[in-house]
UniProtKB/Swiss-Prot annotation:
PROSITE patterns: RIBOSOMAL_L10 (PS01109). GO terms for biological process: translation. This is Large ribosomal subunit protein uL10. Belongs to the universal ribosomal protein uL10 family. It comes from Bartonella tribocorum (strain CIP 105476 / IBS 506). Part of the ribosomal stalk of the 50S ribosomal subunit. The N-terminus interacts with L11 and the large rRNA to form the base of the stalk. The C-terminus forms an elongated spine to which L12 dimers bind in a sequential fashion forming a multimeric L10(L12)X complex. GO terms for cellular component: large ribosomal subunit.
Amino acid sequence: MNRAEKREFVTWLNEAFQKSGSVVVAHYSGLTVSQMNDLRSKMGEAGGAVKVAKNRLAKIALQGTESESIAGLFTGQTLIAYSEDPITAPKVAVDFAKSNDKFVILGGSMGATSLTVDAVKSLASLPSLNELRAKLVGMISTPATRIAQVVNAPAGQVARVIGAYAQEDKAA
């Protein structure tokens, strides 16, 4: 990479840090190419991204962002997992770490809050924004459905009574 490419990459990475809801930093030493591709595809499907960057460039890109406090995590072979949804990157990273012992989560950030390894794991156990939205819609629509059933019930009962009288008249 020449200087211009490095500047462009740092600018791009800085924007990614600013736009992301959460960032997870992990060591990936010993992972095979297929394992890395698997991680990238899982993260991409979930709406996040994985990037391997030189530590020095990542530290420069962190300057001026809310995530600046995690600069100390960038030692050794590190990668960055990030997503706009604060839950996605931690969830995918923790799930991947469970099946790959060479993938070690170092920590991360959510906005201006630095996250320890345990905090990243706790964050991963929470439902995502889409799951929360679905639950909220379900909670809101359920009472409306029940009200509609209660309002329509008397009309249905009247119709059944009239139908029963009609049956009796035909039988007699």
